Amino acid sequence: MIPQVVTSETVTVISPNGISFPQTDKPQPSHQSQDSLKKHLKAEIKVMAAIQIMCAVMVLSLGIILASVPSNLHFTSVFSILLESGYPFVGALFFAISGILSIVTEKKMTKPLVHSSLALSILSVLSALTGIAILSVSLAALEPALQQCKLAFTQLDTTQDAYHFFSPEPLNSCFVAKAALTGVFSLMLISSVLELGLAVLTATLWWKQSSSAFSGNVIFLSQNSKNKSSVSSESLCNPTYENILTS
């Protein structure tokens, strides 16, 4: 069976048993438009990967700051769950590796790299969702911690002896601690939300790339090729189709 290049909008494939399969033929973009689209897509991937790496650095830096904060009776329990979960460190690692791998995959588009980028993007999505949940709980717990801090200071301040012996911090220190933690949690939450959106976008791009670029489409076999054991493939003019000829 000799394949014919059909220029009309409808392509009809007739099999040896006489059954026809009509298919719609979509107009293919020109080479210039394809090259322009590829360049635009590569630029977008680079920008998203760079922002992912920046988010990773931000989350990691804020996590280090929280880990180095001295222990506080009322506020340590607020961010201890965040540190014990390991999100500022493990999540930042996923974000950074995902961004770096996206840059590498954009330069060298291979099937293993595309699948690895897709897997890291999915892990980044799950990690960002976990971090957003923990940070939301931590932000909600700041107000009760502030009230406990104020109450403890008020109780100590009513007793002069206790005031002189324990020398409690000024009441403003409770507000300063709450404001500082609110700022840290807010920056980390913004970075996590941004990372979530970017991870979803990159995962979608790599999923489409892995589905379209590495999958076969149509196989044409002649009737006398049933007893052949090997076939060879060659590309047609239309890159979305494959012509399988008997060797």
Swiss-Prot record:
Looking up InterPro entries in the UniProt record yields: CD20-like, MS4A
What is the membrane topology here? Multi-pass membrane protein
Q: Which UniProt keywords apply?
A: Membrane, Phosphoprotein, Receptor, Transmembrane, Transmembrane helix
Write out the topological domains of type Cytoplasmic.
Answer: 1-46, 102-121, 202-247
Q: Which residues carry this modification: Phosphoserine?
A: S235
Task: List each coiled-coil range.
Answer: none
UniProt key word Iron: no
Q: In which tissues is it expressed?
A: Expressed in thymus, spleen, intestine, colon, testis, heart, liver, brain, kidney, peripheral lymph node and bone marrow.
Q: According to its UniProt record, where is this protein located?
A: Membrane
Q: Which residues lie on this side of the membrane: Extracellular?
A: 68-80, 143-180
Transmembrane intervals: 47-67, 81-101, 122-142, 181-201
A GO cellular component annotation here is: membrane
Task: Determine if Transmembrane helix is one of this entry's keywords.
Answer: yes
What PANTHER family is this protein classified in? MEMBRANE-SPANNING 4-DOMAINS SUBFAMILY A MEMBER 6A, MEMBRANE-SPANNING 4-DOMAINS SUBFAMILY A MS4A -RELATED
What does the similarity note say? Belongs to the MS4A family.
Q: What does this protein do?
A: May be involved in signal transduction as a component of a multimeric receptor complex.
The molecule here is called Membrane-spanning 4-domains subfamily A member 6D
What organism does this protein naturally occur in? Mus musculus
